[in-house]
Amino acid sequence: MCGSSTSQEDVDKLLDGAVMDLCVTDPPYNVNYGSLQEQQEKVGKSKNNHDKILNDNMDDESFHLFLYDFYTQMMRSLKEGGVYYIFHADTEGLNFRSALKECGGSVKETLIWVKNALVLGRQDYHWKHEPCLYGWKEGAGHYFINDRTQTTVFEDKVDLEKLTKDELIEMCKELMEEQVPTTIIHEDKPMRNDVHPTMKPIKLIGRLVKNSSRPKENVIDFFGGSGSTLIACEQLGRKCYSMELDPKYIDVIIDRWEKLTGEKAVLITE
């Protein structure tokens, strides 16, 4: 649905009375990502999509309130014991954690997504990971897959045999440039973010969905972005409720879903 994740009216319209079992979402990081990508492209360091992300360049107080309003809707939508995964930037870690606590949530663990390539920036250490807050709504036990091998670090290796020639060339260029200190090493991420500037790998999202929900359960993504959560749910037999504020990314999500399923999306209401 095209709407705001901070609006109770919009969220109620999306849910239509349904209760969510799981939330996997990737809110704006408040890092003005589109502007950074434009600068990198000017010096030949980036060829990724650099469209602006809405609500990604706020002052501290406004961003905290934005997160508070989103968390309020998230906690309201989840069943007791419903799990949430919140990707975020370490630079805004305090806001992400404190706003969650103010809404009655808590951080049980912080997971680390380790990428296979650094993100170029102006800081001394180039970022090569993203944290993800993990927790659940109090009031009942939460579901977790019967697997005691899970760790807080996701390190999916790149399958070189499956990469195209262009992807291999791109990876070699990144590796040649990567003679700098990084926060941490290894991961598999999209070689090019052609449809969304911060697109998450479907495999990464799929792991979280599989770990914390059962087939046919309801999964909500308050910031649909490129549609990776919806695609992962489609592949794993979950029902996804996805909200996205920007109409152009609504089109991206629909296009990815139609290509995956071979079906045609239907507009329910204007």
Residue ranges and their predicted role:
Residues 1-250:
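Core catalytic lobe of class I
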Residues 248-259, 263:
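Short alpha-helix adjacent to the SAM-binding motif of class I
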Residues 263-270:
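Short mixed-charge
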